[in-house]
Amino acid sequence: MAAWAGFSEEELRKLQHNGEVANQAVSVTLGRGRKPAQTNRSRQQLQRERALQLAAKQKEISQSLLPDQQLTRPPEPPASSHPAPPAETPDEQSVPVKHEAEPVKPDPASPVQSIPPADFKELDKQEVELREKNRLQQLQWEQRIMEEKNKKRKALLTKTIAEKSKQTQAEAIKLKKIQRELQVLDDSVSSDIGVLRKLIEQSSMDYSLAWKRFEKAEAEYVAAKMDLHRKTEVKEQLTEHLCAIIQQNELRKARKLEELMLQLELNAEEVPSPDQTQLQDKQKEPVTENGPAAELERCTEANGSSMSKDSSITETKISQDNQESEAADVSADGLR
């Protein structure tokens, strides 16, 4: 029953059309004024044929359909005074028209020929009513079956919707959990990144300060090296100048000593008498005062003056060098 989806619109239209054709056929047969014997006999034959056809079709349908797709028979109507014909399917309702159109030979041995035409008309009307009732009952039964199927489908649909909603809720919970975990990871990563950025900024500041100190130390080193070079040059110049002064002084002393030695040798060669020496001494007292001793004194004074001049020159040079070195230090401090 679960696999059968019910009657389609085309099948319902066919059923309705077959019912209308059967009603028209019954009305035509009633209006023709058939002979009672022939009608009764044809009715019996029709009942037999219908019963056989119905049994054969039901057998075919039961063989072709699955057990869950087979329909149960509707409840039988209450028993009447006359036997009712079996229920007809929509396909079987079109069969009586053909059989009624065929000529039927009267059967003299049939007991139904004694029925008058009025009773036969009443029987036909009852048969039509029974057919209508059976058709309505079948339609109601089919409607109930369709309603039950629709209920089952609705229940199945609601069940599937509930399952899908539960599944979606579970998936939504999983997604929220994953989002929370991702948010936690993002927060931890962002905090780590913030700490690293702060450390990088601090290290960059330290690097800039160290670079400035390095540049300052390098400038100081260059300035100190230049100052050392200048002072070494000044020292070398002063030592050279001092050596030259000492050498010149020694040369002057040597020349003076040679001159004095020459003068002494000349004086020793000219040895006078005692009287002459006395007279000469008396006469040359001022000369002796201004003689070699004076000359030696003059030489020493000259040497002292030259030494003082040289020392003054060296002092001025040293002072100039000191001023230059101080100016260089001041300029280096200004650059720093």
Curated annotation (Swiss-Prot):
UniProt record, GO biological process: non-motile cilium assembly
Ranges annotated as biased composition (Pro residues): 74-88
Coiled coil: 213-271
Keywords assigned: Coiled coil, Cytoplasm, Golgi apparatus
Protein location: Cytoplasm; Golgi apparatus
Keyword Coiled coil included in the entry's annotation: yes
Region described as Disordered: spans on this chain: 26-118, 268-336
Compositional bias of kind Polar residues: 61-72, 302-322
This protein's GO CC annotations: Golgi apparatus
Matches recorded under InterPro entries: GORAB
Superkingdom classification of source: Eukaryota
Family of the protein in this entry: Belongs to the GORAB family.
Name of this protein: RAB6-interacting golgin
